[in-house]
Amino acid sequence: MHRITILGATGSIGESTLDVVRRHADRYAVHALTAHRQVQKLAASCIEFRPARAVVGTSEAAAELEALLRMAGVKTEVSHGEAALESVASDAQTDSVMAAIVGAAGLRPTLAAARAGKRVLLANKEALVMSGRIFMDAVREHGATLLPIDSEHNAIFQCLPANDQRYRAGVAKVVLTASGGPFRTRDPATLHDITPDQACAHPNWVMGRKISVDSATMMNKGLEVIEAHWLFGAPAEHIEVLIHPQSIVHSMVAYRDGSVLAQLGNPDMRTPIAYGLAYPERIDAGVSPLDLTLAGALNFEKPDLVRFPCLALAFDALRAGGVAPAVLNAANEVAVEAFLQGGIRFTDIARIVGNVLEKAPHGAADSLECVLEADQLARQSARACLQDVTTSAVR
């Protein structure tokens, strides 16, 4: 029985992972589940899957969860806090760790899993964006297995040679596809009027609010560009982004002989999740098979960097190197949260991120401490920028 820990069990990736596990109860057992504050949802999953351990964000949430599980007669051990997250991620009793905590909060536990030599199913792109070299060194030094779960990187992983998943001779470039989000054809002059609800209404994917906004700005694709650099060793000039509104082609690898290999499928995160769980086998993910006769035309176009300045900022951060990607991510997290709370306009997100990236010192990312310090300084700078934003709050 393969034992799994799910970091971020109440988010969209966590819930999709549990759905796949539910379909294969004969081969997977849940060892630990974590959530920050969604105690009711976590309790329901603990009652169903009976994990040995559960972790929440605060002592208050832990007390609430313990009470709910006690009433249900479930003896899951409950703990809270960052140290507890790192503990379950590196627990000797778990085989695979689904790293699905959104944002910088997922960095430490995901790194702990790598350092413990786990099979890491990486859905938390920020771990690589912030600490790419540190993270990849940990994977190599401790014998961890790293399997990308983002649909784009999972697609590239599948399209690279089976005996060498790194970016090697013979590969001309990797191509990340992007839906373009809900504003792909909207007049850029009207983007300042976008509301949080509009930004979260993705045309193809069901996702959490933060990643939905990142998709709308294309910062999500920018972060994926940085992630692809570290996963596959691809320099910025060998990473291309194409808008593909149908979200059927999840990404491609172009080879020097003119061949292009692509991975296709219906837009459902259970496909890459099932791939990561069972690799190198294939299992039923509960996803309807792709019918190309119904899919119709598949369109591709270059991204408009006037409409999507966040994508250009991400390429800038990748080329700058060092802690610049961590600065980019931190500033974006602060700006997106402010937008979701109605404090700034949609177009202020890129403006704030650009200002912070321009002003921040771009030191080397030599240690986790350097990365986390850059993260905190960038957040402080972004919050200062919020005070300077003169646009009225979105309502």
From Swiss-Prot:
Report the NCBIfam families cross-referenced here.
Dxr, PRK05447.1-1, PRK12464.1
**A Gene Ontology biological process annotation?**
isopentenyl diphosphate biosynthetic process, methylerythritol 4-phosphate pathway involved in terpenoid biosynthetic process
At the highest ranks, the source species' classification is: Bacteria, Pseudomonadati, Pseudomonadota, Betaproteobacteria, Burkholderiales
Where along the chain is NADPH bound? 10-13, 37-38, 124, 126, 208
Q: Which UniProt keywords apply?
A: Isoprene biosynthesis, Manganese, Metal-binding, NADP, Oxidoreductase
The chemistry this enzyme catalyses reads:
2-C-methyl-D-erythritol 4-phosphate + NADP(+) = 1-deoxy-D-xylulose 5-phosphate + NADPH + H(+)
State its cofactor: Mg(2+); Mn(2+)
Give the binding site residues for Mn(2+).
150, 152, 224
The protein's name: 1-deoxy-D-xylulose 5-phosphate reductoisomerase
- Look up the record and name the pathway of this protein: Isoprenoid biosynthesis; isopentenyl diphosphate biosynthesis via DXP pathway; isopentenyl diphosphate from 1-deoxy-D-xylulose 5-phosphate: step 1/6
Pfam families attached to this UniProt entry? DXP_redisom_C, DXP_reductoisom, DXPR_C
| Organism the protein comes from | Cupriavidus pinatubonensis (strain JMP 134 / LMG 1197)
Q: Where does 1-deoxy-D-xylulose 5-phosphate bind?
A: 125, 151-152, 179, 202, 215, 220-221, 224
Instruction: Indicate the family of this protein.
Output: Belongs to the DXR family.
Q: What does this protein do?
A: Catalyzes the NADPH-dependent rearrangement and reduction of 1-deoxy-D-xylulose-5-phosphate (DXP) to 2-C-methyl-D-erythritol 4-phosphate (MEP).
